[in-house]
Amino acid sequence: VFAALLALLAPCSVVAQQAREDADALSARIDGPPAPIAPAVINRDDGGNATVRAIRLTAPIELDGRLDEAIYQEVLPISGFIQVLPGDGDPATEKTEAWITFDENSIYVGARMWDSAPESEWIANEMRRDIGQLRNNDNFGVAFDTYYDRRNGVFFYINPVGGHSEFQYT
């Protein structure tokens, strides 16, 4: 089991986007499902798009990669992931569970990834930060659609040996 915990935007200032007067017009332009209603953590549409809900933390978590805090037992994980390579859009061949949580200062992504292959067969040999080659390793990534337009945002990913990268996409 490969477990990862990414602390994103720490420390950060949280600024809400300007509210739009015409919410109906905005929702008509969004290609995908609305945010899930608690206790659900993911909402999918027939087109394969997904929207997830972040959980507000009521107790601190430790960034140790163990994912043993109560939140990971109390909140359903995000699951049902899809592949990018190989088989873009195919269901994941291995089990993956993820949680997105936040507090006043940070957003946290915790994930457990299982692999039926022994560790010696993992494709994870890149440790240089922010190198494109890292995408050719086994990895876990998360994209934040910060404008909720399915076109612009930031992407973070990590491999089993700790190599990591982030980039902005438009």
Model features per residue range: what roles?
Residues 1-13:
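Bacterial N-terminal signal peptides
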